[in-house]
Amino acid sequence: MERVGMNGAEIIDGKAYAAGLRARVATAVPAFRVAAGRAPGLAVVLVGEDAASQVYVRSKHKATVEAGMESFEHRLPATASETELLALVERLNADDRVDGILVQLPLPPHIDEKKVIATIDPDKDVDGFHVVNAGRLAVGEAGYVPCTPLGCLMLLKDRRGDLSGLEAVVIGRSNIVGKPMAALLLAENCTVTIAHSRTRDLAEVVRRADIVVAAVGRPEMVRGDWIRPGATVIDVGINRVPGAEPGKTRLVGDVAFAEAAAVAGAITPVPGGVGPMTIAVLLRNTLVAAHRRAGVALPEGAIG
């Protein structure tokens, strides 16, 4: 267990946990192949030449293949029409080899992201963005949960065990992280507060939390004196800021790490905390989708 300083916070190693989850997924794939006569399949669609998106798509392809799954990569030019993209999604919906469909965001401005997400078959929506899956999460039914908040919950439960009765503050209310994160914590019987840009005296709200999840996209906004001693801090932010050398940059989270680590009981670093969990949970969701679609039981506790 790594700590910051003599009495500082435990560092939550998301990279190590993600590696373990990916290994468990890979271990479960051969049994599915035998039962279903095929490998689980993940289709990733990229529109345009966005550099960051290309990196993410390559990482997802590599991880999918390493897990023993089929990776179906579809690239469209930035000039592709919305109609072309929707037609591709419909073809993937109908393709029995494909268990999960992921359309890499952001999309070019002439394409309606909401319409594209709504076209994905909810049972193949391994990103958990479809309104049907959002509704399933809200009412406690089985569906697909967005990868980042589910990864955060896994790290929290691994660190703290039973979360029942704990005070949790989620900073940020996006559909991708904040809202589903709050729903997951509520399902774990936490007392949940969602904070945002209009929250009055945000620092005071955060100070009462046993669990802080920061997902606002503002570099080092959450200061150390906001953190309750012993709290668990999950930093979802990934922000690029100027580095020490001219022309260089570095990655920081939404939490002032050194300050918070001096007070918290445990904290995720940036990088190496939440980030690696996202692709690992994507593989997990794809494996679950494959089992559900094929009518094959996934042994309880096999992948977490």
UniProtKB/Swiss-Prot annotation:
Keyword Protein transport found: no
Record GO cellular component, one term: cytosol
Pathway it works in: One-carbon metabolism; tetrahydrofolate interconversion
Cross-referenced InterPro entries: Aminoacid_DH-like_N_sf, NAD(P)-bd_dom_sf, THF_DH/CycHdrlase, THF_DH/CycHdrlase_cat_dom, THF_DH/CycHdrlase_CS, THF_DH/CycHdrlase_NAD-bd_dom
Catalytic activity, EC: 1.5.1.5, 3.5.4.9
GO molecular function: methenyltetrahydrofolate cyclohydrolase activity; methylenetetrahydrofolate dehydrogenase (NADP+) activity
Superkingdom of this protein's organism: Bacteria
PROSITE patterns tied to this protein: THF_DHG_CYH_1 (PS00766), THF_DHG_CYH_2 (PS00767)
Keyword set, alphabetical order: Amino-acid biosynthesis, Histidine biosynthesis, Hydrolase, Methionine biosynthesis, Multifunctional enzyme, NADP, One-carbon metabolism, Oxidoreductase, Purine biosynthesis
GO BP, sorted A to Z: L-histidine biosynthetic process; methionine biosynthetic process; purine nucleotide biosynthetic process; tetrahydrofolate interconversion
Binding site for NADP(+): 172-174, 197, 238
Reaction(s) catalysed by this chain's protein: (6R)-5,10-methylene-5,6,7,8-tetrahydrofolate + NADP(+) = (6R)-5,10-methenyltetrahydrofolate + NADPH; (6R)-5,10-methenyltetrahydrofolate + H2O = (6R)-10-formyltetrahydrofolate + H(+)
Role this protein plays: Catalyzes the oxidation of 5,10-methylenetetrahydrofolate to 5,10-methenyltetrahydrofolate and then the hydrolysis of 5,10-methenyltetrahydrofolate to 10-formyltetrahydrofolate.
Family matches, as PANTHER family: C-1-TETRAHYDROFOLATE SYNTHASE, CYTOPLASMIC (PTHR48099:SF5), C-1-TETRAHYDROFOLATE SYNTHASE, CYTOPLASMIC-RELATED (PTHR48099)
Quaternary state and interactors: Homodimer.
Family: Belongs to the tetrahydrofolate dehydrogenase/cyclohydrolase family.
Protein name: Bifunctional protein FolD 3
Native source organism of the sequence: Rhizorhabdus wittichii (strain DSM 6014 / CCUG 31198 / JCM 15750 / NBRC 105917 / EY 4224 / RW1) (Sphingomonas wittichii)
Gene: folD3
